[in-house]
Each structure stands twice: as C-alpha cells, then as structure tokens.
Amino acid sequence: MLLLAAVSAAVGLLFRFMIWAAVSPVSMVGAGESAAGGQAEAAVRTERSAAPQEAGLREDGLQPAQRPVIVIDAGHGGMDGGASSAEGVREKDINLAIARCLEAEAAQYPVEVIMTRTDDRGLYTDDARPIRAKKREDLQRRKELMEGETVTLGISIHLNSFPQDASVYGAQVFYPKEARTGTDVSQVCAQSKRYAESIQKRLETNISDGRERSAMAKSDILLFAQVQHPMVLVECGFLSNPDECVRLETPAYQQLLACAIWEGVNEILCLEKNKSVTVIDSANRG
C-alpha cells in the first residue's frame, strides 16, 4: 500500500508538471531568450564601447581635431583677373593652376585642405555694386576663411608684375609684419615668418633660377591685417618677365612651384606621406 501511494503521488507530481509546462511555454522560452538576449546585449555594448576609440580615427591614426588645417587661396578670380602679361596671360588662371597643384600635394598627407576657390570665380556677391566694393568683399571673405578657428596655416597664391623692368624675376614669399598697435600678434607673425622662410628656401633650392631672395614682412596687405593665424602670401613669379611668364604657364613648372611650397610647409609640420585628407571647397561649406 505504501508503495502504491508513493507511485500515485509521483504520477500526480508528473501530471502537474506537464500541465504547468503546457500552460506556461512562454516562461520557459522567455528564460532562454533572456539568456540569449543578455549575450546579444553584452555583444552590442562591447561594440559600442569600442566604437568611440575608432570612430574619430582615420587610417592615418590621427583624430580629426589633430590634423592640421591648411587653407589654400588662389588669388583673384571671376571679374578680377589680377595682373596680366603683355600677351594677355591672366594671373587668376595661373594662381588657380598652382593652387590646385598645391592641393594635390597636400592631399598626400594627413591634413584638412580648404580651398577658397576651385574654379574661375570670386568670393563676392554678384550684384550692382561698384567693382571696388566687390573686391573688398572678396578679400574679406578670403580672410575669414584663412582666419578660421581651427586653421593651422593660410597660403595665398599670387603672381607679380613689374612692367617698368621686365628683367625682374623670381618667387617671393611674404608674411605679416607685427603691428605696432592693436592686437598683439607677435607669436602669429613669428610662426608666419618661420613658414615663409622655409618656403622661400625650398623655392630657391627646387627652382634654382639663380635668384636669391629672403622672405619679407609686409603690413600693407589686407589679408595680413590683425592676423590671428599663421599666414603667408607667395608671389610665384613675374608675368612681366617674358621668359618667366612662359614658365609660369607650363604645368610642369606649376607643379614644381607647388612641390616647393608644400615641402617648405611640411618642414615645419613634419608629417608623414601617404595618409588621409579631407578637401573642402569653400562653395560647399554652407
């Protein structure tokens, strides 16, 4: 009798368990889903925690905030042709060609490049105002781009002309002269001078045209007024010199100039080649 009672009790327990299992499948599966879900959630948390370590990095290993910002300004453009040769070669066109070559050189390094223009246009509002007012606006907008908060260096590309003496030739680099009044820009001017001297040296070494020049400080250039960031202006040659004008029109010579300018810049930055780059056209900055 005791054995029969025990068996009966066991059968009853088994029957109750089967009923519980039948009416509560979600409870059992839910336990499994909770465990699996916990693993999945943990995996997601792991990926998300790792993401911030990689999200800001480029293949060059530098975070965006660490990359130097270089503004390349092709002088003149649009209605403003700049200087011209006796044969009608326009400064604005050669400025742009050299600037684009310089952009390509910089693109081989971990920098952010901002171009003030990438085609034949000015940075002014095309309205009925006098030309002088448009030119003033154009220069002011260029200065604003070159004085951006994160800018490391601004490089303005130009050409010279001196019709009174067609024998004058050679590239010349200018940098801001420290103002005697107003904002104290001594440190910025010192940094600008360092870049300018490095570029001037590279131009002489790479071009080897027999012309020796020293980087010069200037205070009468609007771009240099109350300068807040290092800036240089490179006069790449004289359109008034017939021989140099022919060279300046040549793509190979334009590339030579751009290489020399960038090598001078990179002597200061000391960046390794073959890294990432972001190129920004001023027209698409919003």
Predicted regions and their residues:
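Catalytic-core regions of hydrolytic enzymes
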Residues: 51-194
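N-terminal, intrinsically disordered, polar/charged segments of Gram-positive cell-envelope systems
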Residues: 20-71, 277-286
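Active-site-adjacent mobile loop/cap segments within catalytic or ligand-binding domains
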Residues: 163-164, 211-286
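Hydrophobic membrane-insertion alpha-helices, especially the h-region
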Residues: 2-19
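Active-site-adjacent loop/helix surface patches within enzyme catalytic domains
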Residues: 144-163, 204-205, 209, 218-228
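Surface-exposed patches in mature extracellular/periplasmic domains of secreted proteins
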Residues: 111-118, 156-158, 207-216, 272-279
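Sec-exported extracytoplasmic/periplasmic mature domains
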Residues: 100-111, 147-151, 159, 200-208, ...
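Active-site-adjacent substrate-binding region
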Residues: 188-217
